[in-house]
């Protein structure tokens, strides 16, 4: 920097520092910078020269010191001043200029290019060529390095504006023609073509049909009080069961008869995955009072009872051997003492022996009589137990056990939760529910219990009213007489039903 300019910059900085109370001057809103003040000049001069318009030059004499105005101050050595930097760059351009090449947009330039063609159509390369040849701004930007930006903008405008249409070029190896829309098109941009075509595109429909068909790992639980009417509800409850069923087979299950809606019709000796005990306790709880049992027999229980129709059970004496299955124990409600659990048997043995006349069913009332009877059997003669679950995809195992009429339960009934406690595989079983209704509930229905509560009598009557020592499910399965063709044809077509009459090793 020469000494004269350096001196001028120093003087301008000093003048600005000496006037700390500089207040903005009133000016029209269209003016960006304030008009120069006369007191900032270094020497007297005419007012007409002091207050020039923003785009005019200040006349100066060759022998005199140049007039220092805020719009003409050189840049100080300490850094650019905000008000000085904008004025040094040159006069302010007109506000009507929208782009670097003028006031016309890309779409207007493209329209001019197409209209200038004899056939009123141009290819994309011809539009590029017209831009470089006609518009001065693009004359030096025709090479590949400097033309990437504006050529990309032209392609966007051709695609997004409805005033341009693309016509197929019949010549081999030629790009398509771009023409002006004869209908005029809209002034603004057309909606994106991809978004407009997605709704009616067959490609989208194919994409939807090819979506993942895996069953959800966590299925919503049915609302409280809802009763499942088909095995599909149980399958949703036990989503991790080995049987490969999912929601897509709902239409298959709806055509079956009502008796197939119970899980007891699925015969298998394999244990299914079971839910944690906390989930069972939270979802299904025993009502606190016996008055809530008023009404008829629950529909689900009726369907479960229908399922046992036609099944001939083995002799009670053949069911006393030890079972190879694991995980359950049972205690008669009338017995005192701790609840025993054994990992190697289905029902834990009870001290003492059964008399020859005692078995799973009473001699006075057979299973067929219980099932075909219109009225519910006397509560004192029926013992219902429920295991949740024991069969594959069958959370319900319904057993009807006869109790001698001499074993009369007391009128006082207490609810006592008795969760199963046992080592080994028995921990997989959440709960075993035993219900023996007292005579006072003879008119009440028999509810379906899935939780832990047990209706037990406070009276400890008789040492001979006990359950069988063990119930061998393998023996039960081997001696089961049923119409296998009927079960297979009703339940499924050979996929998930696992009939295995061989005892597990």
Swiss-Prot record:
Q: Which UniProt keywords apply?
A: Acetylation, Activator, Cell cycle, Cytoplasm, Developmental protein, Differentiation, DNA-binding, Myogenesis, Nucleus, Phosphoprotein, Transcription, Transcription regulation, Ubl conjugation
What's a single GO BP term from this record?
A: response to water-immersion restraint stress
Write out the ranges of the annotated region (Disordered): 1-66, 175-244, 257-276
Cite the record's Polar residues compositional bias ranges.
257-271
Name-wise, this protein is Forkhead box protein O4
Q: What is one cellular component GO term in this UniProt entry?
A: cytosol
How is the protein altered post-translationally, as described in the entry? Acetylation by CREBBP/CBP is induced by oxidative stress and inhibits transcriptional activity. Deacetylation by SIRT1 is NAD-dependent and stimulates transcriptional activity.
Question: Mind listing where the DNA-binding region sits, in residue ranges?
Answer: 100-188
